[in-house]
Amino acid sequence: MGEILLLAAGGALGAVSRYGLNNLTVKLLGDSFPYGTLIVNCLGCFVLGFLMQWGFSSDSHNTHLKLMLTAGFLGAFTTFSTFSYETLDCFKNGDYFNGFSNILANVLLGLLMVFIGAYLGSLLKQNSGT
């Protein structure tokens, strides 16, 4: 039961964080392109790559924290369904450039951010001697 509560707490924090960051992004950059979804997905990819290399790469002694941060927080913070819906919406409105740009940006930048996060996590882990 404790794991479910940790998962729910992480998920609640992730969802609220995504909502807040998306609203801030719309205020700052407008809504002509789904920047909010792109930013949360890239940030989530970076954090997951970092955490999996730095703190959770092997048999972590803190599986509860891993569950709360990865499946809970990052699972709710990032969003494949919103990305897919926003892309389809672009296509339905005839905005093929933004639709394809959204696909390329989320996939390529997501992969790049996981790589960068994992690389930095690995460097930090090596430098800390753990």
From Swiss-Prot:
Keyword set, alphabetical order: Cell membrane, Ion channel, Ion transport, Membrane, Metal-binding, Sodium, Transmembrane, Transmembrane helix, Transport
Residues passing through the membrane, by range: 1-21, 36-56, 65-85, 103-123
Lipid bilayer topology: Multi-pass membrane protein
Domain of life: Bacteria
Subcellular location: Cell membrane
UniProt note on regulation of activity: Na(+) is not transported, but it plays an essential structural role and its presence is essential for fluoride channel function.
InterPro entries the record matches: FluC
GO cellular component terms, A-Z: plasma membrane
UniProt binding sites for Na(+): G75, T78
GO molecular function annotations of the record: fluoride channel activity; metal ion binding
Catalysed reactions listed for this entry: fluoride(in) = fluoride(out)
Gene Ontology terms describing biological process: cellular detoxification of fluoride
Key word Transport present: yes
Family under the similarity heading: Belongs to the fluoride channel Fluc/FEX (TC 1.A.43) family.
HAMAP family: FluC
Function text: Fluoride-specific ion channel. Important for reducing fluoride concentration in the cell, thus reducing its toxicity.
PANTHER family found in the cross-reference section: FLUORIDE EXPORT PROTEIN 1-RELATED
Protein's UniProt name: Fluoride-specific ion channel FluC
Source organism per UniProt: Dehalococcoides mccartyi (strain ATCC BAA-2100 / JCM 16839 / KCTC 5957 / BAV1)
